[in-house]
């Protein structure tokens, strides 16, 4: 049962809810998100004295609607919760009460907050969740959380967090260093939530709109082996971008991930041999997720260390080169026609700015009719099988709509944020830094390509271009 309380600090009042089974440390991390006062500097006064980190909140006599006093000064974050290296850009970003709702950090929960904001960037998925009928479980709590985020005020996702930890206990892991909850891997949170939604939504929305298909061929590398190549079909919810010492572009990393060397037993040779497994996409979904494989297990430190290499990613992705020849043949005519339409649109826009003369109504009507004809031609080129495949991308072209970034040196430390494109203004992106929401220009997103411990892209969300 959640208990509503208020906290007074430096003349300001903060309303929040607490869970009796949580500790004083959890409350202090909530207050840090609201006030920027680091937990170790906070003095929260309760009945009997100062609130201790390891004490259960339900044991100190906090009553509903009680007002507690907090003392402490805001300052730099402690080393256990490092500030991203690019935090100085904050002053260049504007703020407005009309921005989307942020999520309060409940103690190393930025991995969850950024994942929720990324999922929320898919409005059709939110619509599918709103139709979920069950009254219990993680999806029901996610539905409630989405409803509470309709306003612009920051939201405390406590009930959703509790449900997440109940269904996936790994997210309840405690940190040996701080004694509070440990930082978690946002990619694991993303994958887990998607798999839960995939199983739970009766409309099969995730399967239709976010799941792609792979056709893989495995062949022995040794020439003397007369083995027939084996063919397999797999489904994927995320496309890995492998990062080697030679990877400079996301498309390179994806292609590297689609080609693997595998050692396995050969029945013909009666021993282990090297095989090449080459995969190509046989179905492209409406929403394509790309995961930068930036973390690897480093035994010397006992953690997932981070690959800091700079890897450029595109705002517009042409996925045709990742596809099977059969699918590519279906996509290319539509892709080329759509690009032609977009090029014409850009030329008309530049010409209008150059001459600075408003076209007449007749000219506007003629231009609109011409564009409708081009769109109709493009739609007529869509392969019938792709047209009947609900949730499939018939063009192979995508726009970048979301980035989940990580700042820090390992998956179990640092800070996660979400960057979501403004659907009303392509030149602007919303930056979700837990409860703090601000606007950044599209140029800022280009700097998330890595090269150090500052914010670097970890999960990218692409949306299929519309033929319209």
Swiss-Prot record:
The active site is at 110 (nucleophile), 415 (proton acceptor). It catalyses: Thiol-dependent hydrolysis of ester, thioester, amide, peptide and isopeptide bonds formed by the C-terminal Gly of ubiquitin (a 76-residue protein attached to proteins as an intracellular targeting signal). GO terms for biological process: negative regulation of ERAD pathway; proteasome-mediated ubiquitin-dependent protein catabolic process; protein deubiquitination. It is found in: Nucleus. Residues 1-71 form the Ubiquitin-like domain. InterPro entries: Papain-like_cys_pep_sf (IPR038765), Peptidase_C19_UCH (IPR001394), Ubiquitin-like_dom (IPR000626), Ubiquitin-like_domsf (IPR029071), Ubiquitin_CS (IPR019954), UBP14-like (IPR044635), USP_CS (IPR018200), USP_dom (IPR028889). The keyword Hydrolase applies. Its EC number is 3.4.19.12. Keywords: Hydrolase, Nucleus, Protease, Proteasome, Thiol protease, Ubl conjugation pathway. Gene3D superfamilies: 6.10.140.1140, Cysteine proteinases, Phosphatidylinositol 3-kinase Catalytic Subunit, Chain A, domain 1. GO terms for molecular function: cysteine-type deubiquitinase activity; metal-dependent deubiquitinase activity; proteasome binding. Coiled coil: none annotated. GO terms for cellular component: nucleoplasm; nucleus; proteasome complex. Residues 101-465 form the USP domain. Component of the 26S proteasome. Interacts with rpn1. Ubiquitin-protein hydrolase is involved both in the processing of ubiquitin precursors and of ubiquitinated proteins. This enzyme is a thiol protease that recognizes and hydrolyzes a peptide bond at the C-terminal glycine of ubiquitin. Belongs to the peptidase C19 family. USP14/UBP6 subfamily. This is Ubiquitin carboxyl-terminal hydrolase 6. The lineage of its organism: Eukaryota, Fungi, Dikarya, Ascomycota, Taphrinomycotina.
